[in-house]
Amino acid sequence: MGKNKNYNKNQFKKSKTNNDTTVAQQQQTIEEKPDFKIDGSILEGGGQILRNSVALASLFNKAISIEKIRYNRDQPGLKNQHKAGIDLMSRLFKAHLTGCSVGSCKLYYQPTQKTIQDDGVIEADTKTAGSICLMIQVSLPCLIFAPHSTKMVLGGGTNCDFAPAADYIQNVFLPIATTMGFKCEMSIDKRGFYPKGGGAVTLTTQPLTQPLSPITIVNKGEVNRIVIKSYFTSPRISPLVAERMNNTAKKLIKKDFKKVDVETELIDVSKFSFGDGTFIEIRAYTDQGCIFGATGNGAIGVPAEKVAEDAANSLLKDLQDGGCMDEYLQDQLIIFMALAKGKSQIKTGPISLHTQTSIHITSLMTGAIFTITPLTNNTQSGEETNLITCEGISYFPSDLNNNNNNSNSNTTTTTTTTTISTTTIDNQNSEEK
């Protein structure tokens, strides 16, 4: 066992003053005094900093300023898909928002209401092939704590590079995350491929009756089922392309999992897509309830075999690393672990830069204490395994408490107030775009 690393502190500094005064929405003049000033260039240095900080600022009704947004990217500043997510949150929480324009490297966000109002169906659209799932990531932590059910219809890209696929959220993330006690259903109504976008996803949630339960995923077990699905749009794209993807992925996976049943399926989504495209989804299930996922998007000039190889190799690496989840799931669970009541533990492979970033932002804004414990290496690939432990803050907003009291609930819950402290961390840059 290695030495524990505590992440209950952060280099970010709580802001005391900010003399900038701007004209707010609806012609109101608001003095911008952020509770937190966040350096958007640290660690992963990308959109995840925006999504986590805006989500938590909304939950805790705190004002934030973010500077150096995506500062080390080839094209710094906000992209349209980031702007769409922040605009969505601004509408949900009637926020005072400045600097939220494409290319902006600085923004200020201050929610003016403490919860999402029941105003009917929530609609948002990236207007491009920008990722729908990035809008889900920023909004879901808040939607599940709304005092009423919610329905959200989102437009944009469903299968995008540098973002989770809608299939991954639906088939990997949600089945695992909802074991913490929240109810969320998702449907992919229309596929939106790059570069046209035009996809549609519907997300519904039900109000919680108690804080999130902690999550424990420490026993991987044995892989007992693998599913490979390749999607295509006919007649522009032949089913033979999707079949080549399936065959390539299955051949690679069977080398390591000879005795495991590998299911394959070809799916024509031409009637449910805007534009043409191909996509491969691979999932591995274990006898202990773990789910691993990998995806790949077809592209002009890229052989179908290459798309399948990359997805299959990504899945195989995660399975060989010895953790109980793939590298993409680990960072997406962090914010929910922090908000839960009690101690959560997840066993992972190497700690990704996205996970480090999520831990730092979440620790800063919630006060939740994270510990990363390196575990004895027992994997085929020689990679490290780690145990991420979090003492959650038992977050439960007062309006949900009131709802429960009004319905004579026997559940007793409280909202925990936390104290935030700061420390210094190494500044690292990510090559991700």
UniProtKB/Swiss-Prot annotation:
Catalytic activity: a 3'-end 3'-phospho-ribonucleotide-RNA + ATP = a 3'-end 2',3'-cyclophospho-ribonucleotide-RNA + AMP + diphosphate
Name of the top EC class for this enzyme: ligase
Main localization, broad class: nucleus
Compartments it resides in: Nucleus, Nucleoplasm
Start and end residues of each stretch annotated as Disordered: 1-28, 400-433
Membrane-spanning parts: none
Entry superkingdom: Eukaryota
GO cellular component, one term: nucleus
Main function: Catalyzes the conversion of 3'-phosphate to a 2',3'-cyclic phosphodiester at the end of RNA. The mechanism of action of the enzyme occurs in 3 steps: (A) adenylation of the enzyme by ATP; (B) transfer of adenylate to an RNA-N3'P to produce RNA-N3'PP5'A; (C) and attack of the adjacent 2'-hydroxyl on the 3'-phosphorus in the diester linkage to produce the cyclic end product. The biological role of this enzyme is unknown but it is likely to function in some aspects of cellular RNA processing.
Protein name, as recorded: Probable RNA 3'-terminal phosphate cyclase
Organism field: Dictyostelium discoideum (Social amoeba)
